[in-house]
């Protein structure tokens, strides 16, 4: 079954790049802006209540998780009220130890058991929304009064319905490129807003 990327593919690189960018524009127009507002408001609330924000993801989404955490933590470090944001995707020793000893499905949930506290926030980033290690981490968080939010694509998978909040990127199945592109831009957008929000407070 063909998806939109298959349909716009052309051996003419100029045409493909033009149509790819046009498809990204279409996706952006169909994202619910209220869900982005909800995420920003939630992150600010967690900071104001001295709570931690944890980002999790696999593959390209792990890179987005790291970038997101970096932007809002390091980007606000010089101000009075920075964000306590952490990516649980970054420590190779921890990830490989947990994966080796407990299985890949446990690499995030076991970190949350060690670090996360009541009313913290876990943000899961996933194109499919079905990664078992993310689902397990979100289930644990929900059961332990840790707030949850997800960025998803495709049909939203399990995460879309499991998390307390969600930003859904409306792509077709297996369109990883556009899904991860838009997730990264959302991360940049949220980070840009939060940095300026903190600047305005100072």
Annotated model-derived regions:
Residues 1-31:
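Generic N-terminal amphipathic, Lys/Arg-enriched alpha-helix
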Residues 36, 60-61:
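N-terminal, charged amphipathic alpha-helical interaction modules
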Residues 49-50, 162:
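Structured helix-beta-strand junction loops
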Residues 61-201:
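Glycine-rich phosphate-binding loops that contact phosphosugars or nucleotide phosphates
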């Amino acid at each position: 079954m063909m998806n939109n990327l298959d349909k716009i593919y052309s051996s003419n690189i100029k045409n493909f790049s033009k149509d790819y960018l046009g498809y990204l524009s279409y996706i952006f127009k169909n994202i619910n802006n209220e869900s982005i507002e909800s995420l920003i408001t939630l992150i600010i609330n967690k900071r104001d209540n001295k709570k931690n924000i944890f980002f999790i993801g696999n593959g390209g989404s792990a890179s987005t998780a790291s970038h997101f955490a970096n932007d809002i933590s390091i980007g606000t470090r010089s101000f009075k009220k920075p964000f306590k944001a952490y990516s649980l995707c970054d420590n190779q020793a921890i990830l490989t130890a947990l994966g080796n000893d407990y299985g890949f499905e446990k690499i995030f949930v076991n970190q949350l058991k060690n670090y996360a506290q009541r009313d913290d926030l876990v943000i899961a980033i996933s194109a499919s929304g079905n990664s078992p290690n993310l689902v397990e981490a979100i289930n644990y968080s929900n059961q332990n009064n840790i707030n949850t939010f997800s960025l998803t694509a495709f049909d939203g998978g399990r995460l879309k319905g499991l998390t307390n909040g969600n930003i859904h990127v409306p792509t077709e199945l297996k369109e990883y490129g556009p899904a991860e592109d838009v997730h990264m831009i959302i991360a940049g957008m949220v980070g840009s807003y939060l940095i300026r929000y903190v600047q305005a407070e100072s």
